[in-house]
């Protein structure tokens, strides 16, 4: 019985953790749509938006070039 409780808890935890990371779409002023893995972070000091692309590469874009950020 305890074995089933552990398995059910592990599966529930896996679903809870996987639901926390959403993908976002950034629309740029020149018409590009950038898909991100997780929420982009805006640095007010530098004016850059940091994000990870769909392949997992760390990228940055100037905040002035982004028109909107939408959760997917």
Swiss-Prot record:
Its main location: membrane. A lipid is attached at residue 20 (N-palmitoyl cysteine). SUPFAM superfamilies: Sm-like ribonucleoproteins (SSF50182). It is a lipid-anchor. It is found in: Cell membrane. A lipid is attached at residue 20 (S-diacylglycerol cysteine). One of its GO terms (cellular component) is plasma membrane. Residues 1-19 form the signal peptide. InterPro entries: LSM_dom_sf, YgdI/YgdR-like, YgdI/YgdR-like_SH3-like. Keywords: Cell membrane, Lipoprotein, Membrane, Palmitate, Signal. To E.coli YgdI. This is Uncharacterized lipoprotein YgdR. It comes from Escherichia coli (strain K12).
């Amino acid at each position: 019985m305890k074995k089933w409780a552990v398995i059910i808890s592990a599966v529930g935890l896996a679903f809870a953790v996987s639901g926390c990371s959403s993908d976002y779409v950034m629309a740029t002023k020149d018409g590009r749509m950038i898909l991100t893995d997780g929420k982009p972070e805006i640095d007010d000091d530098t004016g850059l938006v940091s994000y990870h692309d769909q392949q997992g590469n760390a990228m940055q874009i100037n905040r002035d070039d982004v028109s909107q950020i939408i959760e997917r």
